[in-house]
Structures are given as C-alpha cells and as structure tokens.
C-alpha cells in the first residue's frame, strides 16, 4: 500500500520521481532511482526518509503507511480538520465504534443529509 500511496501523492503534487528525489536531497539521478525503487517496492523506506517524504508531499506519514483505503481516507480527513474538529472527531470515533446502533443512526442521518443536499442541487440546476 505504501508504494501506491507514494505514487498517488507524488502525482497529485505534480512532481516527477527526479524532482521529489532532488527535494529529498538525494540529487536528481540518485533521487529518481530511489523514488522509483520505493514506488516499485524494491527498496524499503526508513523512518527518517518516510517523515521527509510525508513532509514534502504534504501528507501525514500515517497516510502513506495505512493498511487500507478507508484508513488512509480517515487519516487525511483528520489531517485537514482544524483542532476543534479533530478533538470532536477523536471523541466521537470511539463512541461510534463501541455502539453499532449509534453508528447506524449517524450513517443514516448523513445519507439523509447528503440526499437532501443532492436533491437541492438538482432543483437548483433545473431552475437555472
């Protein structure tokens, strides 16, 4: 998963392997080769380089290491939240995990809200 997330994050930033390697301080030639080996799972990454890559790509290191897409998405969402939102979510997540009925209700409310929002957007588009 690390290799795929590294590739995706690098491409989203519009960086070539060479440019990212150069920003890591590896030089253009060596850097390109090293990033290529990371992206093709030929070379494992050390913690120092992981932290530097995450910083250069503006993603949390945990995002690059997440076990699955849902976890990666949650990590990115938390990273983009402000302190108040992050604190609220940090207390909410364990409560939702511990109470499946509460989680089901919250999911239902979110789906309802998203449906209403989509309906409003369609009505707005039809009115234009």
Task: List the model feature ranges, each with a label.
Residues 3-24:
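Short basic helix-loop element that most often maps to the first helix and adjoining turn
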Residues 6, 20-21, 32-38, 64:
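Conserved hydrophobic/aromatic packing and binding residues within compact polymer-binding modules
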Residues 11, 25-26, 36, 40-42, ...:
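Residue-level detection of the helix-turn-helix DNA-binding "recognition helix"
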Residues 16, 27, 31-34, 46, ...:
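Short coil turns linking two alpha-helices in DNA-binding domains
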Residues 20, 49-57, 64-65:
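Hydrophobic micro-packing sites on short alpha-helices
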Residues 23, 67, 109:
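Short acidic/histidine-centered micro-motifs embedded in hydrophobic/aromatic stretches
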Residues 31-34, 40-55, 71-72:
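Short, basic-rich loop-to-helix N-cap that marks the start of a DNA-contacting helix
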Residues 70-128:
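Interfacial/linker helices and their anchor residues that mediate assembly or domain coupling
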């Amino acid at each position: 998963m690390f290799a795929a997330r590294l590739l995706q994050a690098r491409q989203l930033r519009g960086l070539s392997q060479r440019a990212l390697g150069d920003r890591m301080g590896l030089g253009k030639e060596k850097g390109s080769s090293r990033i290529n080996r990371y992206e093709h799972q030929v070379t494992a990454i050390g913690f120092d380089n992981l932290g530097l890559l995450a910083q250069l790509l503006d993603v949390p290191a945990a995002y690059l290491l997440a076990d699955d897409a849902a976890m990666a998405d949650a990590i990115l969402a938390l990273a983009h939240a402000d302190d108040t939102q992050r604190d609220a979510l940090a207390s909410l997540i364990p409560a939702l995990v511990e109470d499946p009925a509460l989680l089901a209700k919250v999911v239902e409310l979110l789906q309802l809200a998203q449906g209403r929002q989509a309906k409003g957007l369609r009505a707005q588009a039809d009115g234009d």
